[in-house]
């Protein structure tokens, strides 16, 4: 007992181990602790620091370390081969005798924060023991500074896994491993404590160190956390002179270091950043101004001149326009003394404290089906989504993300910027996704390991890239639109890279994501931890239905043009807190999501429901090198018909019929009408501009080009 007490005291003093959560689940009749394994000393921490004394099972190879062998004398343990059935039987006997057993189902020390492979031997032990599973999430925070290493053991509620519905022992083991992984992912996600985004950024600065390189833009001058901290404090102080606490401030800036500094500066001063889509034209900008009730917009003179955005500035009549170039003249000597002598030394004393459930940012829907709406995202929601992604993807400080998607796109803003800032993953921001030759070259020169893009942009990159340009890339993640089959095939054949498709919406950021451990062709992965889903059946659609989701990453509500600045809480047919995505989705027995199409993009023709997305897939199969888009047209008799816009001047209906037969699609999936045009109109985020196409369908002069 004395030795155990001294071991626990040493752990708390030297490693600052802290235990959180309700310990009651540990005192059950049969208890099996499942824990992640981020550090070689985790077995020692579990064995000595919990309110119970478990028998810790850990891999035999970890005893090669002298430190581990020394510390193993202070707690009960067993070495085991996670694939050996005899070892599993030994652990079962321990549980049957009433001992509490702790194990690491991943079988090794983790590479990153995500949950890795779960061994079937661990799942077998969890199933056959009949024990209550108590997830414990182990978190290491190695801050810069003596004695600042902190270890947190988060105890979560007990659960059970029950894969008995699966037929066959192997299927049950595989299902058990999936349930075990989902349990550990949920524990990792729930261990996160929400705070203000700027506080989370300061935590990352402290954890990684101010000299650590974190951000690079097209100037190719690496910037450190310290550079970003200084920029955020300076820009924040300058912006605070022209704005009020809690005010929504428009941000119209490209993907640059100063843009990230401006967003962080607004967060530092307790302002709300409204990310403006500068490709939406004067009408779109004016709509966003009214919707978000903007009085101030921050931009750059150089950006406005180079991008030709003068008409957008003119549309912001009555709005104060702040240019980042002016900070050099307006940031005086006293400001610089404040920055260097006080703010940089104690940034937490100058930042404005915020409620994590207050609005952090406003993004706008794409407007592909009507007037854009403002989407209010809270600090807690954005951090929740970042945490969800980090539990399924192995981001680490050794990675470098190449992100060319504009920050007004939620996919780019959350996963492409904030995730990197808060996890310490290096980020390269490129100013435009439209430079199809430059982006592959940057990936080659800067050793990018992650590439974010939409299907449209990824297709163009593949067309212009050299086979060696993406040699260092580990993950290519597609989002924002349906991944084209031809695009996925091209990337696999030309670069040897599988594209992992994500699915989400501005209203709830990323909902599901394909990963190496959760991949099925034609699907968009499984729901992220903490996200719930329900399906609303649609008459005429046999498989799947409209997806409704609920979770911690959901928006606070919409802002509408006719109710400026007012946040309208989200709800759906299933009640408050549920969001109706409008997408028809089919979820299989293993939890994989398959997107069937938008519910608004189904036509009833000859008594059958026809998906416009299927019409586009047939066109893509017939002419994979060109873009195509399908819309509905109301006929004079009151029915509906399909219209295909194509950039292929040689595409004919006979080719479409041949492609439909090859795909096994019904003949109704071949468009009744076809219009050739030089290029398909796109929005700034790469999505098809269906509003513009509907306007063209209504224009009689366009039908002169009909085939």
Show which residues each predicted segment covers.
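Non-catalytic C-terminal accessory region of glycerolipid acyltransferases
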Residues: 86-204
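Conserved AMP-binding/adenylation subdomain of ANL enzymes
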Residues: 383-400, 410-449, 464
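Gly/Ser/Thr-rich phosphate-binding loop
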Residues: 324, 448-453, 462-521, 532-534
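Conserved C-terminal "lid"/linker of ANL adenylate-forming enzymes
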Residues: 320-326, 603, 630-634, 643-645, ...
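Conserved pre-ATP/AMP-binding loop-to-beta segment of ANL
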Residues: 321-324, 328-364, 370-371, 394-400
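Conserved AMP-binding/adenylate-forming
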Residues: 238-280, 404-406, 609
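Conserved ATP/PPi-binding loop(s) of AMP-dependent carboxylate-activating enzymes
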Residues: 523-530, 539-572, 608-610
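AMP-binding/adenylate-forming catalytic core of the ANL superfamily
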Residues: 297, 451, 551, 556-557, ...
């Amino acid at each position: 007992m004395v030795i155990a007490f001294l071991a626990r005291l040493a752990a708390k003093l030297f490693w600052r181990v802290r235990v959180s959560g309700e310990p009651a689940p540990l005192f059950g009749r049969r208890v099996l602790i499942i824990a992640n394994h981020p550090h070689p000393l985790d077995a020692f921490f579990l064995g000595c620091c919990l309110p119970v004394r478990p028998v810790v099972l850990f891999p035999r190879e970890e005893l090669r370390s002298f430190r581990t062998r020394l510390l193993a004398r202070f707690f009960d343990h067993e070495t085991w081969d996670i694939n050996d059935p005899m070892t599993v039987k030994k652990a079962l006997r321990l549980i049957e005798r009433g001992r509490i057993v702790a194990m690491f189902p991943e079988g090794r020390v983790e590479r990153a924060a995500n949950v890795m492979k779960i061994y079937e031997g661990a799942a077998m032990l969890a199933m056959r023991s009949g024990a209550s599973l108590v997830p414990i999430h182990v978190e290491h925070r190695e801050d810069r500074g003596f004695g600042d290493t902190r270890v947190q053991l988060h105890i979560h509620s007990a659960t059970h896994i029950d894969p008995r519905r699966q037929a066959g022992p192997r299927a049950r083991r595989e299902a058990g491993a999936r349930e075990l992984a989902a349990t550990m992912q949920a524990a990792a996600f729930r261990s996160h404590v929400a705070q203000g985004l700027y506080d989370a950024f300061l935590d990352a600065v402290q954890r990684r160190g101010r000299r650590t390189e974190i951000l690079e833009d097209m100037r190719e001058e690496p910037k450190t956390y310290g550079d970003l901290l200084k920029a955020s404090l300076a820009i924040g102080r300058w912006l605070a002179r022209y704005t009020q606490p809690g005010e929504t401030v428009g941000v119209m800036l490209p993907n640059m270091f100063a843009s990230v500094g401006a967003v962080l500066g607004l967060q530092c001063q307790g302002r709300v950043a409204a990310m403006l889509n500068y490709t939406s034209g004067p009408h779109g900008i004016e709509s966003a101004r009214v919707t978000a009730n903007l009085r101030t917009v921050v931009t750059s003179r150089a950006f406005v001149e180079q991008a030709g955005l003068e008409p957008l500035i003119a549309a912001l009549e009555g709005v104060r326009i702040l240019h980042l170039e002016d900070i050099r003249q307006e940031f005086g000597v006293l400001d610089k003394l404040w920055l260097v002598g006080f703010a940089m030394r104690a940034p937490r004393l100058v930042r404005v404290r915020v409620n994590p459930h207050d609005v952090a940012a406003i993004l706008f829907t794409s407007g592909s089906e009507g007037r854009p709406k403002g989407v209010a995202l809270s600090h807690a929601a954005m951090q929740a989504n970042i945490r969800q992604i980090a539990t399924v993807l192995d981001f680490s400080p050794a990675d470098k993300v190449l992100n060319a998607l504009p920050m007004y796109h939620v996919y780019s803003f959350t996963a492409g910027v904030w995730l990197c800032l808060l996890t310490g993953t290096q980020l390269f921001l490129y100013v435009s996704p439209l430079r199809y030759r430059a982006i592959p070259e940057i990936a080659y020169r800067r050793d990018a390991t992650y590439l974010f893009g939409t299907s449209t942009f990824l297709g163009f990159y593949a067309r212009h890239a050299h086979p060696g340009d993406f040699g260092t890339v580990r993950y290519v993640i597609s989002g924002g639109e349906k991944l084209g089959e031809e695009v996925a095939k091209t990337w696999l054949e030309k670069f040897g890279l599988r594209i992992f498709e994500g699915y989400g919406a501005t209203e709830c950021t990323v909902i599901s994501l394909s990963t190496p451990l959760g991949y099925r062709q034609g699907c968009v992965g499984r729901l992220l931890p903490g996200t719930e889903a329900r399906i609303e059946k649609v008459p005429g659609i046999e498989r799947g239905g409209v997806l409704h989701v609920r979770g911690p990453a959901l928006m606070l509500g919409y802002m509408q043009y006719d109710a400026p600045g007012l946040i309208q809480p989200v709800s759906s047919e299933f009640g408050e807190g549920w969001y109706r995505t409008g997408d028809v989705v089919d979820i299989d027995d293993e939890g994989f999501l398959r997107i069937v199409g938008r519910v608004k993009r189904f036509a009833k023709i000859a008594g059958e429901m026809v998906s416009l997305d299927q019409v586009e897939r047939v066109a893509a199969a017939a002419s994979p090198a060109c873009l195509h888009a399908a819309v509905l047209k109301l006929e004079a008799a009151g029915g509906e018909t399909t219209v295909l816009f194509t950039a292929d001047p040689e595409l004919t209906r006979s080719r479409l019929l041949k492609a439909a037969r090859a795909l096994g699609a019904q003949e109704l999936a071949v468009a009744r009408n076809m219009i050739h045009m030089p290029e398909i109109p796109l929005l700034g985020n790469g999505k098809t501009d269906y509003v513009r196409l509907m306007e063209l369908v209504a224009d009689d002069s366009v039908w002169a080009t009909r085939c």
